[in-house]
Design a protein with these regions (language model features):
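Positively charged N-terminal leader segments that act as targeting/secretion signals
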Residues: 1-2, 11-30
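Sequence-pattern detector for short linear motifs
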Residues: 5, 19-22, 33, 203, ...
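Ala/Thr-enriched low-complexity intrinsically disordered regions
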Residues: 6-7, 28, 36
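Intrinsically disordered, low-complexity regions enriched for glutamine and histidine
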Residues: 7-10, 17-18, 87, 233
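Hydrophobic alpha-helical signal peptides and transmembrane signal-/tail-anchor segments
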Residues: 9, 22-23, 40-44
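Feature targets compositionally biased, intrinsically disordered low-complexity regions
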Residues: 14-16, 24-26, 40, 112, ...
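Short, Lys/Arg-enriched N-terminal segments with co-localized hydrophobic residues
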Residues: 31-46
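Core catalytic alpha/beta fold that binds nucleotide/phospho-ligands
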Residues: 43-268
Length: 268
């Protein structure tokens, strides 16, 4: 198996409104206060990873997107039962957030109209150095856009809105015994479960591999390492500082992710 994890970004305070995130590297802690440097970083090359999230209950001007950049299945307002409506609205919001991130990154929004699906049904752009990934859970949607100036870009993202589950039983379905033993000792089983689940999902989604391969990803929580045959080497992010649990994989070292949320009128 290939080692893909060189570092992890962790936040595990229960205070959901906190913005600073902590980067856990090998042997040292480094702190990045994103809001303080966001404007400056827009003008330097290392600003390559953009993450935006929003809730479908908040209004967003989907009609401002040029019609030619919208796939046919998103042109009409979602209708049907509540679950179908929720899912379609999440897709519209994801498309809108990706449009916003392309503009924020100074990248051509024409890419939005060129999205195609791979053989594994993963949506992506027709250019190798720019990749994106989308996840939604409940009414929440998150989008990651990554631009790599020197090589092929590969990213994956997973969000999970907290809900009551039999975490131990679920762990037994995909985690080896050693990881289950570690999980049983954690004081916050919910946070520990979503860490194990979301990190795996993010890795697999970067290559369009489904959760059927979840158990093939090896997670060593004490060593902060993940091994997988389905992903290139890179770094992972995990946090519970947002309104949901969040994990992302980026095939780049020393990543500098910048988070935005939609506040009804603009990304903040």
């Amino acid at each position: 198996m290939r080692l893909i994890l060189t570092a992890l970004l962790f936040c595990h305070s229960k205070g959901r409104d906190k913005r600073p995130l902590f980067f856990w590297g090998i042997g040292a802690w480094r702190i990045s206060f994103y809001n303080a440097i966001k404007v400056i970083c827009l003008f330097i090359i290392c600003m390559t990873t953009f993450i935006a999230y929003a809730n479908i209950q908040q209004p967003f001007p989907f009609d401002e997107i040029p019609r030619e950049l919208i796939p046919e299945n998103l042109h009409t307002e979602p209708q049907g039962n509540s679950r179908i409506t929720q899912r379609r609205q999440c897709r519209r919001l994801a498309h809108f957030l990706l449009w916003q991130l392309l503009k924020t990154a100074g990248t051509s929004t024409a890419l939005l109209g060129q999205i195609y699906r791979t053989q594994s049904d993963r949506p992506q752009f027709p250019v190798e150095n720019i990749d994106f990934n989308i996840s939604h859970s409940g009414d929440w949607v998150a989008v990651l856009l990554h631009i790599n100036e020197s090589e092929k870009s590969a990213v994956g993202i997973d969000i999970e809105f907290s809900k009551k589950r039999n975490f131990s039983a679920l762990m037994a379905h995909f985690a080896p015994q050693a990881e289950q033993d570690w999980f049983a000792k954690q004081p916050d089983e919910e946070q520990a479960f979503y860490r194990c689940w979301c990190l795996r999902e993010a890795v697999l989604k970067s290559q369009g591999v489904g959760i059927v391969k979840l158990s093939s990803v090896m997670h060593l929580p004490k060593q902060l390492q993940i091994f997988s045959d389905y992903c290139p080497k890179g770094e992972l992010i995990f946090t519970d500082e947002l309104p949901f649990y969040f994990a992302a994989f980026i095939n780049q070292s020393k990543i500098q992710p910048h988070f935005y949320h939609w506040d009804r009128k603009k990304l903040l």
